Every structure is written in C-alpha cells, then in structure tokens.
Design a protein with these regions (language model features):
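The serine-hydrolase catalytic nucleophile loop
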Residues: 62-75
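Alpha/beta-hydrolase active-site loop
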Residues: 100-119
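Short beta-strand/loop motif that positions the catalytic acidic residue
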Residues: 210-211, 217-219
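N-terminal cap/lid segment of alpha/beta-hydrolase-fold proteins
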Residues: 2-49
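Conserved alpha/beta-hydrolase "acid-adjacent" motif
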Residues: 224-230
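Catalytic histidine-centered segment of alpha/beta-hydrolase-like enzymes
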Residues: 250-262
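Conserved alpha/beta-hydrolase
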Residues: 75-96
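Hydrolase active-site cap/lid region
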Residues: 143-196, 213
Length: 274
C-alpha cells in the first residue's frame, strides 16, 4: 500500500530507517473528506523492529494538538507498543478549519486512519481522550470494521452536559463570542460559531454499534468534567461487550493519565487489535 497521504501533497517525505527499511518519522498535512487540512505525525515506534506491531492512532482532547507536551508524552508511551499517529483536530494547532467540538472531527480521524494504514500496518487501533474519546467511539460506530480495537479515555456519554463547573466553563467557551475569543487567542483553538445541525450521534448511542470490535472504556474516579455515571452509562450501553477500567485517583484525560496507565492502554491495544 502507498504511504502517501491522500488528497494532499506531503510537506515531508517518507524516509526508510537505515537498519530496518521501515519508514522513519513523518510530519505532514492531510486533507479531510470535507477539504480541511489536518496536521499529522507518524512515529514508527516499536514497529521499527516488530513488523507485526499495530499502529495506534491517538485522538487528543479539546484544546490539544500534536505539539502539546501532554499529547507528546502519551504518544511516546504508546510508541512502546507499536507505531503511533497523532494529529491535530481541525481548529487546533496548525490544522485548518474550526473546531466543531466532536462533530466533523470524525472526518479528521478517518483521514488519519486511512493514512496510517498506508504505512503497511495490518492492525490499527484508536485511542481517544475526552473529546477525542467521543470521536473514536462515533467513528467506530459509523464505520464498522475500519479499526481493530478502540480505547476511549475520559469520554462523555451524552451531549450538552453541564453538571460540573469545568463543563459549564467549556460551554461558555464554545457558545459565547467572548469565549471563542479566549479559545482562539488563549488556547490556540479556533471554534466554529454554528450550533450542531443535525445533532450528531452521541457516544452512548454509538457504543452498541461498535461490537464485535474490542472496546475499552477508561475513566478516573476524580474526573472533574464527567462523573462516573458517564463511563458506567457507556459500559451498560455495550451490553457487556466493553471492558471498563475505573481508575482510582485519576482526573481527566491525558493530563491525568500517568505513565503506568498509558502502558496498560498500549498493552491492551496491542493485544486486542489482533
């Protein structure tokens, strides 16, 4: 298979590793199905020496991007278990467009997955955090059979949740003009001003459609954004198919995922994707 990104000229070329012949690190742009340029990074990780290793595609949380230290730390940890692809969602970092806070971002993930498979990996798993977790769940439901395992960390179960102070602040950031200015200039995140129309499939509606693809739901019992009814609702919706890890003392998303947890997620993804 070709390892060139579809629909866009690469900013950097793929160079094989001198010892293994496998591709070295690549940083480039893809174009999504709706024409948005998305920055993406490929790291061969453990796949340099293990041709059977999977590629793990990481979907970051809201306000993240490929250069955020917490995103890079997670990517480095997961690279011990396979190749890694990270990308900046639309409206984040150097990607184009504006964030739709989980709706059109499914197209960003789809482009990254297609590109990741182009490097010749037989297995691919998605690992999403917070907003990115909702995206990997919806993608797996909408495009069955395109991934081999799905891990969702700190995902909401339902839309429009305002039951915690951090989520009330996030809704102000997204829905108010002054909030979007803070997002643009303070958080390097450009947010679309339009409401969802139609309202996308919610994570809890997506989960029953994912089986038989292996599904992992990870959530901290000190998550300040989404309390424990969210992961429990997701697990219940799976009808017993999903694995649920409730992590003692863990907060929210990448910032709260310590190295030991990242290792466990990487090990799970490598085992369950094949």
């Amino acid at each position: 298979m070709s390892n060139r990104p579809a629909g866009h000229v690469a900013r950097s070329t793929v160079r094989p590793d001198d010892e293994t012949g496998r591709p070295g690190p690549v940083r480039t742009y893809l174009r999504t199905a709706d024409g948005v340029p998305v920055e993406v990074v490929y790291d061969p990780g453990a796949a340099v020496y293990d041709p059977d290793a999977p590629v793990l595609v990481i979907a970051h949380g809201f306000t993240g991007d490929v250069d955020r230290p917490h995103v890079r730390r997670v990517a480095a940890g997961l690279a011990r278990y396979g190749a890694v692809v990270i990308f900046s969602f639309r409206g984040h970092g150097r990607s184009g467009g504006r964030s739709t806070v989980g709706d059109k971002e499914v197209l960003d993930l789809a482009a990254a997955l297609a590109w990741a498979r182009g490097f010749g990996h037989a297995r691919v798993a998605t690992v999403g955090f917070s907003m990115g977790a909702s995206v990997v769940l919806r993608h797996a439901a909408l495009h069955p059979g395109t991934v081999d395992a799905v891990a969702a960390v700190s995902s909401p179960a339902r839309w429009y949740y305002r039951g915690t102070a951090p989520m009330r602040r996030l809704h102000w950031l997204v829905t108010r003009p002054e909030g979007r200015l803070v997002g643009r200039y303070g958080l390097r995140t450009r947010i679309h001003h339009r409401d969802w129309d139609p309202i996308p499939l919610s994570p809890v509606e997506a989960v029953p459609l994912i089986a038989p693809t292996p599904l992992l739901i990870v959530h901290g019992d000190r998550d300040g954004y989404f309390p424990l009814d969210h992961p429990r609702m997701l697990a219940d919706a799976s009808g017993g198919h999903a694995e649920l890890w409730l992590e003692p003392g863990m907060g929210h998303a990448e910032h709260a995922a310590d190295d030991a947890l990242v290792d466990r997620i990487g090990d799970w993804a490598a085992r369950r994707s094949g």
